[in-house]
């Protein structure tokens, strides 16, 4: 379908043209490149709504597959779609289609890819050899099972006599002490293979790459890639020489150097020409590299600084060539080929072990009825695909069913998709991109999950292939407008990324389409310029060792951040509040501190707390180190095996038993031999020693408890044991009274929850649980302390950049920008890559030599490029979290050296910094500082001037504060801190402290403070209409409360109640069930109602007993009444209409004393609503006993009943009017007892 047939954007619409295009475009595969803050979720929701309400071709919501990255995102998507549908329903209250969509929403396929896979597997489990009752494996349980399977396989391999290849593998890849490296290789290959649609095929390809028989080095993919890298390095060297020549030609430059530099340039051009031909050509050319010696010059004749720069640039060029010579061309091509020949059979054995491991691991999971997340993807793929003759995957009959079912497949965060997930998506969508039904949204600049095997190349490939028009394939749409941030944040981010992100280094071209464009409007603000603060760490401040240096850097940055936050809060810094559309004073919750990883978080937290700043960080370690958890773990170790001195002594010394050092010594002195446990038993058998009665009592109490716990542990569940220990020791309550008690109790609850999760696995018992925990600790998988903080707490948050993705904060600090990138993965003994497979050193155990191989060199360089690109994207995510103020902080050790490096590109005349500068960066500052040092706002340029920096860069419309901060000034103690220390010392010595203080009034106010919302804490935030009615009228026994939000089918009564008659409530519920389900299209007679009731019994809407209790005559009498006839003749009838609405708390609670603006959530069910020509009538059915209960008959009953139900019907009417946007003309109560009608008047 052509573009012009799409719906036009409505006049006055707030959607941008690109957003509207993303909402309505269809008829082909569509890729939406949505920049940070561009409203992609809103676009996605609007697209779904437009498809659902399309007048010509409406689509049911369960015919859409919406794939999100997280469960939280899926739930938010459902909520947003639900809210949007409810708004449509208000405008079109009679729309059955919209009501149907709301009912279908909960079962719609809006989920993560894993949830969709699970849904497919649950539906078609019989196509797989798995138990339909399978469960998802716990991650730690999964890892432990892997270790068990691997141990078994290796034990068998070691036991085989004729197993030469295995022992050669062991000799090459294990140390003298253990075979941990071999185990890591097998597990890593298993994981890497799992990220491919056909793991075995990928493993086979990996081995085949080492089969070089009949090949030359030119045939190897590794050599082809490395040649491209050789060209890159030679271009870098050439750039250095050209720059040196420019400097040499300056008036004060060393012109005599020109002759040598020109010779150097010819040499580099010769090498570059060889690199364009073949590996062998470069190898031969490298053997003849010879650099001329520089001619001596009289340095006093020339500018000394320029001479140094020229010589430095030449040395850099020589170093580039030298690195190539040493790493790649010090060995003959044939030597590299021999490596592959020798390693080929060994690698074949390694892959055989990986396959064996995968098969056995799969078998043990099948036996235990468990699957992991990788299984979910592969099992789903297995169900949806068949293998064609060419080995390619083709859609199975099941996949074709899904293709027919789904009108469109929408994928959020597409940049984080992996190869297996892409295959699954392809199988359930149309084959042709030009006529496809796949809608993908994402931002490849925010693809930061390569460590989870996400493949940004999938997004990039389509982005390059698709066009804006989508005429010959898929269509791409750029959403570049950012509705989150101020101009200063966006311009600052653009200024940096226009200089550092390119296709060669960074994988993405940061062009005009990729640039962030302003979409949000903010009032004028003060001090909104972005900032770069570089802390200079002087030599005398640096602690010994690399670790000490890191601690010092963390402390310096923490101090600076704390000072800035404190200053901003104290000075009344303002931020914009979108809820009130006004500027307001900044609060602690408006600040976030972003880190690449969390090692610095504890130091930053400590510093902020010292400054009185509330702070929270979700740490990934420290749980098992927490005192309360440690003590409890020792209790359980003693329960499992009391003959363990250290755990038992720890428990005896803990608050649980409460022995002091003297008592422990007295106990040990009782018997010098034997375990503590044996000594304790011996001590208790004897009479209490003189002065040891209290000790005897304490031990007796504990020993009695311990025996009970040991017996309980043998018979009952672990989680019950834990709670029993908490209860009987009172320890849970005890820690609640300590400082940080809320957090400590949360930690103990997590231990209990962890035990329950453990019991849901294939492991059982206290001993195995303790071993389970030990294995977690051995593998370094400690957990963070339990979360004891609400989302809206007024605290500064510290989090990783990864955790911050998708979030936004008014003020963002990005710290640790001077920390080196983590290149540990590149230093491993073996490397794995999706395209290049396996690479490791060549190890000859007989000659005891090892050296790098061509595959290792290629993979290492490729991974370094990918790491650089990923780190750029991580930085982009960090900078785009800020709404109003962005503050970048980094620490450097040698200011002069770093400045020289950063200013090296100051004269560069193009926007994009040289490739070698960007590729050689070792930290974020190596990108940020060279970029900002080309802008007029950098203080350094005030001294140096613009030079040759182009105006469009130098004068770029962005505001920055760039400055160095002296680390010494940060570490100097503050006067206020010294004053606090004096007060603390006085308090410790129990001395009186002066009351005269500027905080005296504040202390008094806090001590006498009364919570202004106290009334709200005494009432429920959610009420049913019936409960509100009871608040107004006391119950007199004749009323039956049976209204619920949704009435469930009536179940069989418990046996002990079967012989008794129905209660008033049960009888009322049965009557309402009949009134809800009776067919109004049939003629209403006693016979027809009896027949319908019988059908309700068959459908299990009613039980036989309940059907017998219903008065059919009363049902018929209603329909013969004037009101009943109106129901039968009405234009439309709705029965059992559930509703939820917000109500003023004053209306809900008669004696409400709280704030007038407080609201509560009210829910209820309206029995019947009829629409007639002149409006809507609301009917509420009542089964109250009236006849014979009121001496004055109905005349006496009427005002009482009217008053009793007036509030209830008023709330029903209010809910209807709010929902339908039409007034309710009449409110009627119908009483089956006596066939009475009461019309409620206001």
Curated annotation (Swiss-Prot):
PANTHER family documented for this protein: ATP-DEPENDENT HELICASE_NUCLEASE SUBUNIT A, UVRD / RECB / PCRA DNA HELICASE FAMILY MEMBER
One Gene Ontology cellular component: DNA helicase complex
Organism: Bacillus cytotoxicus (strain DSM 22905 / CIP 110041 / 391-98 / NVH 391-98)
Protein task: The heterodimer acts as both an ATP-dependent DNA helicase and an ATP-dependent, dual-direction single-stranded exonuclease. Recognizes the chi site generating a DNA molecule suitable for the initiation of homologous recombination. The AddA nuclease domain is required for chi fragment generation; this subunit has the helicase and 3' -> 5' nuclease activities.
Pfam families: PDDEXK_1, UvrD-helicase, UvrD_C
Record note on quaternary structure: Heterodimer of AddA and AddB/RexB.
Gene3D superfamilies in the cross-refs: 3.90.320.10, P-loop containing nucleotide triphosphate hydrolases
Domain UvrD-like helicase C-terminal, chain residue ranges per copy: 506-806
Single GO molecular function: 3'-5' DNA helicase activity
The protein's name in its UniProt record: ATP-dependent helicase/nuclease subunit A
Highest taxon above the source species: Bacteria
Family according to the record: Belongs to the helicase family. AddA subfamily.
